[in-house]
Amino acid sequence: KGVIDALSLPEGIFCDIVPTGSAAGTLSDEICEELSIQPCAVTAVAGHDTQCAMVAVPTEKDDFIFLSCGTWSLLGTELSEPLINEKTLRCNVTNEGGYGGKASFLKNIIGLWLIQETRRQWQKEGDSLSFAEMETLARNVKPFSCFIDPDAPDFVAAGNIPERIRAYCRRTGQYVPESKGEILRCIYESLAMKYRYAAEQIEFCTGKEYDTIYIV
């Protein structure tokens, strides 16, 4: 409500916020007829695929780190209430509403977008590699030759990611990857290092140590 008031927006255009698991009603007759189904109850879910995936984390522990790894990667933990202070501001960590009134305390990171765009570029050049083939290429080259910051502005827009990676490495005085395997290895290892850095920021902000990361 404070944000709505600060922006001078009419409150009436927004829906009510309801707890996850709340009964939302029953499917209308029109929808049931269209889908050829019987009337059924509708329940409010967590409202976002990442939050829904978090519910499925196979642990009963309170302290864990989750990694939702898709086009974007979201890495964080679950807290009983939002954590907002100078540390979280400095680390650019966000709080999102989660299941059961809890807060998802997480970092947004560019994820497999880099792999997807790299594959798309090579397809344009006439080389249609499967993701499995790309993984094999990455496994067969020397590790830790060069790194990028996946969140650098260089890699946000669609386009020729392999060439941008080479330009980034050249500009930062690193080994410049040439082969497809080297490009892919650079992406995978850079993402892994970014995840480690994000996990350390989560620990810094919460004052806790986490011994498990769940990929959801």
List the model feature ranges, each with a label.
Residues 13, 209-216:
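Short, intrinsically disordered, charge-balanced linker/junction segments flanking boundaries
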